[in-house]
A protein has these predicted regions:
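Rossmann-like dinucleotide/flavin-binding elements
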Residues: 367-398, 440-451, 461-478, 483-545, ...
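Generic beta-strand/beta-sheet core signal
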Residues: 20, 94, 160-162, 168, ...
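A short helix->loop->beta-strand "cap" motif at the edges of active sites that frequently abuts
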Residues: 88-89, 207, 280, 455, ...
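Rossmann-like dinucleotide-binding cores of NAD(P)H-dependent redox enzymes
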Residues: 398-435, 515-567, 623
Length: 645
């Protein structure tokens, strides 16, 4: 079903894949640039039935780096529509107002406007309660923006009333404390959003209009699914909408929305609940990143279209590759894209560094000759380097010491809910084969090998290794690295879990290793048999919001946490730790190092390359310790700055 056409009003869309709105942060002036055009055109070319671009209705409602309808150069929007239409793809423009959901720092001198002066728990900036004049102007801005979109050749407008942005703030008693006609006590706060939709309809006539809603606020005391249904039904009965896009909750919801902690298509039943009572088409959202999920929710009648933003962010040709049965770069739902946007940074994908750089890629794709490049290392940096090397025209050979490509990503895929990383490795393996890269596994990059081949260019991507903190009295028999634990035979893990375990390091590695072990805890295991010891004030500081669901899961498994704590001494099964000026001990039959590492570089090889004046570069963890995303970016950026004679 996913590749069958469907209609929205009188408008036919070629398939059921809708690329949802994403704030890119690319705007630096009032006119869209080639960077914007290339970003959306690649996804139109990649098989989306429609792509959605964000447009704030006015300057006050714009996020940092967002175009707004009051100041945007009209002809640049028209150019975008033409570029998208050239690929049998429709253009949706989402009409947006941030409301209170922006930081004062990023909003500049513009006041944050909201139904009431209630600060967002994310940004902690108190907005101004909108006056009657501001309400009228904003409503007119929605109408004017819609008229502009129709004029420049867009196909559909989508009115944003979701995720905690302005219009959705009227629905909630937590954010709408007004006492006038637009207050929550009047029609549960639906009056103003319904009037905004009516103004948009009056401005565009029979032009297709979508409304994007959160199925529920998913915050204690907030609005529920039944409230959202009533709103959508009122809008449908008034003739102001032609379809509904249904997402999950708000950004501040304690319930996970789009991370890998959410099951695939997990929020589609909310779309199905609305579809049961509405006659207009419904677009489902959240964690719909593969054909199986899309076919399932369509066949179950939960929706008419499948909306996804990040599947197209990860792979611009996502839909075309699916239809052709080809491998595609899968979204990992790591949420690093969302984290960047919420911090006022530009949109990016940790696993697809070309996202946002499509215009540059078009100019630079074939800069190399048929000279040889050897890439040493089969981890994320090595695979990306080999990919870009081949794309740039090098005859490329990748040397991998292990039996399989992937490096430390193979270990990172072992904790619960991280198996998607194996799909990324499989995609890269297929891509390298398609590009003609020679991959030599179980092959050491010896100095003799490099001397014999004398490649034009060598990329050293040999990764890193753990560097255990020495602890007095702790022997190797009891002291392991997280990497050793993840590779340990199951029977040895089971034996280890009969005792107590202390993990040194409460970052991503430590927390995910704890989850890996907690999943294997035997019945009747000692309470708090796994302890995580972290020197910093918080656990998971390198994970951002992704730490919260993982910490909750670990708490359910009785994993205990010690912060601002340093391990100092081991005596038998007593691990002495220092918390401020206080020293105490915790029980630990096994200690696991989940802290930092050190780069691995063959200095003899690199010195020889230097002495022979042969071109080489060191990338990824071998250059600077980071994570998989930074390693991939490092390798990618090497080739953006590589110029050949």
């Amino acid at each position: 079903m996913v590749f069958t056409p469907f209609r929205l009003r009188e408008l036919e869309l070629k398939n059921r894949w809708i690329m949802l709105a994403m704030h890119t942060g690319f705007a630096t002036g009032n006119a869209l640039t080639e960077r914007d055009y290339a970003f959306y055109e690649e996804r139109a070319k990649g098989g989306a039935a429609a792509v959605t671009v964000l447009l704030a209705v006015n300057e006050a409602g714009a996020l940092k780096g967002m175009y707004d309808a009051e100041t945007v150069e009209k002809e640049s929007l028209r150019t975008l529509a033409e570029r998208v239409h050239a690929h049998d793809c429709r253009l949706i423009v989402q009409l947006f107002h941030c409301g209170r959901n922006e930081s004062a720092k990023n909003h500049g001198e513009k006041p944050l406007l909201a139904p009431s002066a209630v600060a967002s728990p994310i940004f902690r900036t108190e907005p101004q309660e909108m006056t009657a004049e501001e309400l009228a102007k904003t409503k007119a801005a929605f109408a004017n923006a819609a008229a502009l979109c129709k004029e420049i050749g867009a196909d559909i407008v989508e009115v944003s009333a979701s995720a905690g942005y302005l219009l959705s703030e009227f629905f909630s008693p937590l954010t709408n404390q007004r006492t006038d006609v637009y207050g929550y006590q009047t029609e549960n706060g639906m009056t103003y959003p319904l009037e905004a939709l009516a103004a948009v309809r009056a401005a565009v006539g029979d032009f297709p209009i979508l409304v994007k809603v959160s199925a529920a606020q998913m915050v204690e005391g907030g609005y529920e699914l039944t409230d959202t249904l009533r709103f959508c039904k009122k809008a449908e009965d008034a003739g102001t909408i032609d379809g509904v896009t249904v997402t999950g909750g708000w950004h501040e919801s304690p319930v996970e929305q789009i991370s890998y902690h959410v099951s695939k298509g997990g929020y589609a039943p909310f779309a199905g609940a609305l579809k049961k009572y509405l006659s207009v088409p419904v677009i489902a959202c959240n964690r719909i990143h593969d054909a199986e999920t899309a076919e399932r929710i369509l066949s179950q009648g939960l929706c008419d279209f499948c909306g996804t933003a990040r599947a197209f962010l990860a792979d611009a040709a996502f839909a075309n590759r699916l239809q052709a049965g080809k491998p595609y770069l899968p979204c990992q739902s790591c949420n690093k894209c969302i984290a960047a946007v919420l911090k006022g940074k530009e949109l990016f994908c940790a696993f697809n560094p070309e996202a946002g750089n499509e215009a540059f890629e078009h100019q630079r794709r074939k800069i190399a000759t048929r000279k040889e490049c050897i890439v040493i290392g089969g981890g994320p940096a090595g695979m990306e380097a080999a990919k870009k090397s081949a794309e740039r025209g090098f005859v490329t050979t990748l040397l991998c010491r292990e039996k399989e490509l992937g490096g430390q990503l193979r270990l990172a895929a072992l904790p619960p809910k991280k198996e998607g990383l194996l799909d990324y490795i499989a995609y890269m393996k297929a891509t390298l084969a398609e590009l003609g890269v020679t991959v030599l596994t179980e092959t050491e990059a010896t100095l003799d090998f490099i001397k014999e081949r004398k490649p034009y260019f060598t990329v050293v991507a040999t990764g890193s290794q753990p560097e255990k903190q020495p602890i007095e009295g702790l022997s190797d028999e009891k002291y392991f690295t997280a990497q050793e634990i993840l590779q340990m035979p199951e029977e040895k893990i089971a034996e280890m879990l009969q005792g107590t375990v202390a993990i040194l390091g409460g970052g991503a590695v430590g927390l995910e290793t704890a989850a890996f072990l907690a999943q294997r805890l035997p019945e009747g295991a000692a309470e708090f048999g796994i302890k995580i010891i972290e020197q910093k004030e918080k656990m998971g500081m390198d994970m951002g919001a992704m730490a919260r669901p993982l910490l909750n899961e670990l708490k359910k498994k009785n994993v205990s946490f010690l912060t601002t704590t340093t391990a100092t001494l081991m005596d038998g099964s007593k691990l002495y730790v220092k918390i401020g000026e206080m020293t105490l001990f915790v029980s630990a039959d096994t200690v696991i190092w989940a802290g930092g590492g050190e780069p691995v570089v063959d200095t003899e090889l690199t010195m020889w390359l230097m002495d022979e004046r042969m071109s080489y570069a060191v990338v990824g963890d071998a250059n600077e310790i980071g994570d998989g995303g930074t390693a991939i970016k490092d390798a990618y950026e090497l080739y953006t700055h590589l110029y050949l004679a």
